[in-house]
C-alpha cells in the first residue's frame, strides 16, 4: 500500500459530542463498550476499506479532548484528506459551533479537504434539540454530505465513515460520484460498501 492508498481523516467538534465513541464503534465494533471510552487515550486508529475494488487505509485521527483547551493546531490538520465535523443532536450549542469548526478547517486545513457533517446521539430521540432538516439544509448550502449517527447503537456509523471515504475518493482519486444517501437516525442504509 502506498501513500495514495492512505486517507487521513479527522474527527472534530465540541467536547462530549461522541467523537471517540464514533471512532471506536467504527474501527472495533465487536469490542465497543460505551462505558469504557477514555477520551484522552485515543490518538488515531486505522481501518481498511474497499472502494471500487481498491483497498484503502483510513487513518482516523481523534482530537482526544484537546478541543476543550483550544490546543488543536495546524499540525493536526496537515495532510488531512477529510474531516468529519461532529455535533450532538441533544445539545444545540454543539450544533451552533459547527460554523466555527468549519472556519477552523478553512484556516488550517488543506485546500479542497472533504467534509461530512455528523449529528451524533440520534438514539436519544426524546432529548433531541437539533432538527435534522436544519442540519441537512446547512450541509446542502456547503455542498457536503450530512448524516445522523448513534455511536451507542451503531446506527449509521459505518455509513458516515464510508460517506467520508467516498467523498475523498471522488475528490482526490477521481472516482465517479456515488449515489448520495443522507440517512437520518433510524433510516436503514440503502447501499453497503465492502469493509475489510
UniProtKB/Swiss-Prot annotation:
It is a lipid-anchor. Pfam families: Ras. One of its GO terms (cellular component) is lipid droplet. Keywords: Cell membrane, GTP-binding, Lipoprotein, Membrane, Nucleotide-binding, Prenylation. A lipid is attached at residue 196 (S-geranylgeranyl cysteine). GO terms for molecular function: GTP binding; GTPase activity. One of its GO terms (biological process) is vesicle-mediated transport. The keyword Nucleotide-binding applies. It is found in: Cell membrane. A motif (Effector region) lies at residues 36-44. GTP binds at residues 13-20, 62-66, 120-123. The keyword Flavoprotein does not apply. PROSITE patterns: RAB. Belongs to the small GTPase superfamily. Rab family. NCBIfam families: small_GTP (TIGR00231). This is Ras-related protein RabG1. The gene is rabG1.
Amino acid at each position: 500500500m502506498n501513500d495514495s492508498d492512505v486517507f487521513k481523516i479527522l474527527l472534530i467538534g465540541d467536547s462530549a459530542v461522541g467523537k471517540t465513541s464514533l471512532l471506536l464503534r467504527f474501527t472495533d465494533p465487536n469490542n465497543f463498550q460505551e462505558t469504557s471510552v477514555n477520551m484522552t487515550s485515543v490518538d488515531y486508529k486505522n481501518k481498511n476499506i474497499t472502494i471500487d475494488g481498491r483497498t484503502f487505509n483510513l487513518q482516523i485521527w481523534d482530537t482526544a479532548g484537546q478541543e476543550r483547551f483550544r490546543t488543536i493546531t495546524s499540525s493536526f490538520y496537515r495532510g488531512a484528506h477529510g474531516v468529519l465535523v461532529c455535533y450532538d443532536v441533544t445539545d444545540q450549542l454543539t450544533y451552533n459551533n459547527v460554523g466555527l469548526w468549519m472556519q477552523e478547517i478553512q484556516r488550517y486545513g488543506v485546500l479542497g479537504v472533504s467534509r461530512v457533517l455528523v449529528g451524533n446521539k440520534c438514539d436519544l430521540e426524546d432529548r433531541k434539540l437539533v432538527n435534522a432538516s436544519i442540519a441537512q439544509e446547512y450541509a446542502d448550502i456547503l455542498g457536503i454530505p450530512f448524516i445522523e449517527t448513534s455511536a451507542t447503537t451503531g446506527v449509521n456509523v459505518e455509513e458516515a465513515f464510508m460517506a467520508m471515504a467516498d467523498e475523498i475518493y471522488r475528490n482526490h482519486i477521481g472516482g465517479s460520484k456515488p449515489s448520495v444517501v443522507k440517512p437520518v437516525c433510524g433510516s436503514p442504509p440503502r447501499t453497503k460498501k465492502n469493509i475489510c
